[in-house]
């Protein structure tokens, strides 16, 4: 039995080295900048954008909105907020997994449209087929569309522009 153990020792050592290399490659070491208060502020921006978009949509007198029974939800890889807008339930996500997906746009913000029963009905799904695949993310049994933030813009400009993107999506989804 000991000769078998000795025969596999190089394989085990090679596998152990490979696993250590994977661990090393997957973890990006912290820099002093990563641990600064400024980095914490940068990370907070994504949550603030989602919250502000919900506020802007709620304040729009052209939309019938409600947050009744809905709450903000943070999770390990992101943050989500929902809002009833007219006949739809709109869910806005900041999600790092969606952001990192190599098959879709590199985008931190995504939106899903459902009915008030929280279903992506056939008419909604038909409208979503109009978008190219790289503009769609499939997550939580829903199809999400990107909300592309402006670069080098103020907080207000970013949020207003995303609200306008949502308005265009709503218009398209409503079309008969």
Where are the language model's segments positioned?
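Catalytic cores of nucleic-acid endonucleases
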Residues: 1
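Short linear sequence motifs
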Residues: 11, 20, 39-40, 72, ...
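Long, solvent-exposed, polar/charged low-complexity segments
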Residues: 151-176
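Residues that form generic nucleotide/phosphate-binding pockets
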Residues: 18-21, 52, 56, 127, ...
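Polyanion-binding interface signature
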Residues: 25-150
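A conserved mid-domain beta-alpha-beta active-site/ligand-binding segment of alpha/beta enzyme cores
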Residues: 4-35
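Extended aliphatic helical segments
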Residues: 4-6, 12, 49-50, 90, ...
